[in-house]
């Protein structure tokens, strides 16, 4: 049963809905009401199937950008729809502590004060970090609130909350107990700017124009070497030659077979290094000789492991050269590069320098070249965890939308390297490991034993058991990679590891993850691996992957490109709902990038403005409905109406309503959100506003003495209009929540305390769908559009009435047109409407007419006596000459063999399309002229 409007408050509702839609005031009001009413604060004991989403936590350092706005619009559309489906929905928000980003900001502040973090001390530094987080970290949250996120702010989480920090320690300890976390020496990506290791995924590879330096190493002894006195190597990083421990050649390379096993003398240091044979070497590249620096190159590290070579680190962690660099000690790595090249040249060992474009890894945060550095770090063994995820993926867990991303995810899980999780920072989750030292010796070595425990108290008890009561503990200085805690996000936020937590029991696993393709491994894979290890389940059923927000030139938005758009500027100008709707409607398909235009000089966007205009359209349509419901007391409901006794236009809009209900629900469920938005837009703007409301105006606006039949028809149209508008607002709510909530309370009466956000999705009545009727009305609307075009061509003024004739062989269409004669007359400003079969058209002349065809309908607009026929003929003759001239030019171009052979296919195709359009236009004008004879 359809709710009835509160008739006593309808007049007030019209007054309450101002003539102009004020998005900012409306949004502010409803966001406050939703929060005060606890609309999005579910109880785990509430009825309804559970549905949960944890939002990707933005960094506390961040400000709202278009990526956030896009992600928010998609997530909120999904969760609001599920709420309307009667689900017990939890959408949980939170923020990430962003170790490197926050620490970088704070260290820049300290630098301005003439301090370093070491001078300030760890405790004071962390006090500053928490103070900064309290003052600035809430900015992104307040900005997210402006987007109308229907999240449970009472359950807001922060990755360094006490509960979440305990979960991080628990996860670390468990993985260590399972042998999946270990401490070892390995080459890591070192960022000298932040003095920290960074993961492979925090490295951005850039193409750089540099040089390839060729130089020689002399053989230590000239024995049986086929006259070879030197071996030539080449590198883009000559400063690393100071750490060389060998030169490798391919074992199949006959040029060097006699000198494998001999030694070379390393310039400047005098160190003797062996010539070794290794299959890794490409004998066809350069001279076929490769310098081996295990402590500064991943490939060389592997060679060193195979040949048991020494590992010599020649750089400090700040990027300067250490004592192993001999005469170059103390130089910055790039200064050392210049100095080494110059010294090689002076010794006559530099043979060639050539320009060389190559890939250089940069720190994503520090923005400086990464230095592969040998370091003792904490690692997670990834392969056992990845294998569990691959097994789940075989069972379609999780499902990816679109499904092509499942392969990308699987590829990431295949051949995976161990994950370096320690970071040389202070802001973050400190590693729960304590080194066992003594009161007299607090220094750490590679052999210093350590204890991994949940707390220092637990660690001390274990240390005393193992090493005696005089054991002294020193906690590891490092913190965990931010992605470690983010990997626990879907279940740590719900109370894990407390298995008795009601939220965890009710809402885990979660239902949907919405995220960008760029962090499938950064975050998605790590969440699935962590969840598999700790819960035995995948953390979400579905993963909806969206694309990027690009500008009108299809460029990725970024600070460096200077083409980013501040969403708050667009929100201030057009409103949150307009921005949200524009973003979702632009999605052509799941995973596709979207484009948003922006005029920087005017702070305007045509795309978002169009969405704002749509909001205005809905606002005005609702005001129209309220004005025409204001004197109504509904004594009957829609369910009591006899469908077959409704006007055909009522039956048509109800068919369209049922169809859009069915299609929209399916699209929302399948994450076809862009298609859902487009379908609702077409229904609301075209079907409901432009056609149905225009069709029923005649029935709503009764004369002074209406008949009982007129009053009955008016009541029916009011009931149908109310039903359609009410259900449209419910279906539109996930996309434009503030606007629809305001209009809902206008339609149902402002005394209605029930929030639209908590209503039920409209029941679907497929029996109302009538495909034949919809097809007939489509023909009718096409004919009406044609009449309007013919009137415009004839130059008729809006006030001028003219007869119109419709001719068709289709009997069903004839019947519809005859029943809709009064509506046609009103919509075409006709003083007379004739509906004829072709055999009837010859019974009397229609005089000089403009004619056209729309589908199965021929339309005649008799205009003799209404316009200057000669002037109209002259204008049409000019149009014909123009079209024929265009035809001639295009035909000659396409008949030219040279053009067809040399022009790009795209240009030729455009020319053919223009020719087709010109032919159609010429034929149309000829028909118009024929009707005027």
Curated annotation (Swiss-Prot):
CDD domains: Anticodon_Ia_Val, ValRS_core. Residues 807-833, 864-933 form a coiled coil. ATP binds at residue 559. It catalyses: tRNA(Val) + L-valine + ATP = L-valyl-tRNA(Val) + AMP + diphosphate. Its EC number is 6.1.1.9. It is found in: Cytoplasm. InterPro entries: aa-tRNA-synth_I_CS, aa-tRNA-synth_Ia, Anticodon_Ia_Val, M/V/L/I-tRNA-synth_anticd-bd, Rossmann-like_a/b/a_fold, tRNA-bd_arm, tRNAsynth_Ia_anticodon-bd, Val-tRNA_synth_C_sf. One of its GO terms (cellular component) is cytosol. Its main location: cytoplasm. A motif ('HIGH' region) lies at residues 58-68. Keywords: Aminoacyl-tRNA synthetase, ATP-binding, Coiled coil, Cytoplasm, Ligase, Nucleotide-binding, Protein biosynthesis. A motif ('KMSKS' region) lies at residues 556-560. GO terms for molecular function: aminoacyl-tRNA deacylase activity; ATP binding; valine-tRNA ligase activity. GO terms for biological process: valyl-tRNA aminoacylation. ValRS has two distinct active sites: one for aminoacylation and one for editing. The misactivated threonine is translocated from the active site to the editing site. The C-terminal coiled-coil domain is crucial for aminoacylation activity. NCBIfam families: PRK05729.1, valS. Catalyzes the attachment of valine to tRNA(Val). As ValRS can inadvertently accommodate and process structurally similar amino acids such as threonine, to avoid such errors, it has a 'posttransfer' editing activity that hydrolyzes mischarged Thr-tRNA(Val) in a tRNA-dependent manner. Belongs to the class-I aminoacyl-tRNA synthetase family. ValS type 1 subfamily. PANTHER family: VALINE--TRNA LIGASE, CHLOROPLASTIC_MITOCHONDRIAL 2 (PTHR11946:SF93), VALYL-TRNA SYNTHETASES (PTHR11946). Monomer. This is Valine--tRNA ligase. It comes from Prochlorococcus marinus (strain SARG / CCMP1375 / SS120). The gene is valS.
